[in-house]
Amino acid sequence: MGVTETSTYRDLHLPSLIIGGSFATVAICLSLYSILQHLRFYTNPAEQKWIVSVLFMVPVYATESIISLSNSKFSLPCDILRNCYEAFALYSFGSYLVACLGGERRVVEYLENESKKPLLEEGANESKKKKKKNSFWKFLCDPYVLGRELFVIEKFGLVQYMILKTFCAFLTFLLELLGVYGDGEFKWYYGYPYIVVVLNFSQMWALFCLVQFYNVTHERLKEIKPLAKFISFKAIVFATWWQGFGIALLCYYGILPKEGRFQNGLQDFLICIEMAIAAVAHLFVFPAEPYHYIPVSECGKITAETSKTEVKLEEGGLVETTETQVEASGTSIKESVQDIVIDGGQHVVKDVVLTINQAIGPVEKGVTKIQDTIHQKLLDSDGKEETEVTEEVTVETSVPPKE
């Protein structure tokens, strides 16, 4: 560590702490306000528990960043916390889209109906053959034809990232204790480059699965304006990860000071600013106002909001529909939190177990196939040896004795 690098860090630390702390405070206050609004009007638990989980990403990021920025000793545990919650937030966003589509059963029905459209155009028999033979390529190029398989792949992609991200976070902590992690060091004898490669691939695959799922279902999600939600969330996950990776490269090649505290501090400072921007965006992207009203059939309260919609018919006629929504009474924040923790936790555990079983299944089949192949080769070799011995005995017995 050079004297110049140490001096640079000391000169910038206090101003960055003040500026970063200000942005982090704004981010936390705005996010908590938005979260409390959803908890106060918790009228659609299926959707709102995942919205709250996504919104909570901002205060988690902002809090751990300002703590890490104030004291570099807490950098690693804060980074582990951020990585774990990032993976969970990505899973929560995917679950939110599924909830907006009416739940898993309706999503599967919709995807199955979508997959039948190409069959009608191309011919059922030919398309079914292509679907069976090229499922992977269909997922990459034409996910519409996969039907139920698309939902399975999407869920597997999100959950595998959550599992790998959490596992690598604790592996990082273990390697750091052993002194072989080498944060920001791209050297083969450190664990850092290997973990970066694994997480990069895992994250890219998870995001790609989410993009493909969005491409197929975005027409059904128009009511919630999915593009703005998708961009705002993806920007946090994608930008912060590659931002940290880019800073590590710049420090490694000497473009920025190589001091570890400077590298981590710069990342934390930028995240504090970015979380304030994200918190403002979330107020408009994930508003609580749509949940302030519920269908009139679900509540006996009189205060209501009425909206009229004009529907044009093909023949030129006009139909006016009236929708009445009742203003929802406030819900208990304690009960809302309990539902998020208990019901959401059960949902996560179920999907994690299902994903692990899906991953173990092909491995078990592969191991069984290898064992069967080895066993068959051993039997074949034993059979050949027995045949050779029999031939030798036959030859010896068939030779006439010498006179």
Curated annotation (Swiss-Prot):
Membrane topology recorded in Swiss-Prot or TrEMBL: Multi-pass membrane protein
Gene Ontology CC entries for this record: membrane
Region (Disordered) location: 381-403
Domain of life: Eukaryota
Alphabetized UniProt keyword annotations: Membrane, Transmembrane, Transmembrane helix
Pfam (any one): Solute_trans_a
Record InterPro entries: Ostalpha/TMEM184C (IPR005178)
Transmembrane residue ranges: 16-36, 50-70, 162-182, 191-211, 236-256, 269-289
Subcellular location, record wording: Membrane
Sequence similarity: Belongs to the TMEM184 family.
Annotated protein name in UniProt: Protein LAZ1 homolog 2
Organism: Arabidopsis thaliana (Mouse-ear cress)
The organism's taxonomic lineage, starting at the top: Eukaryota, Viridiplantae, Streptophyta, Embryophyta, Tracheophyta
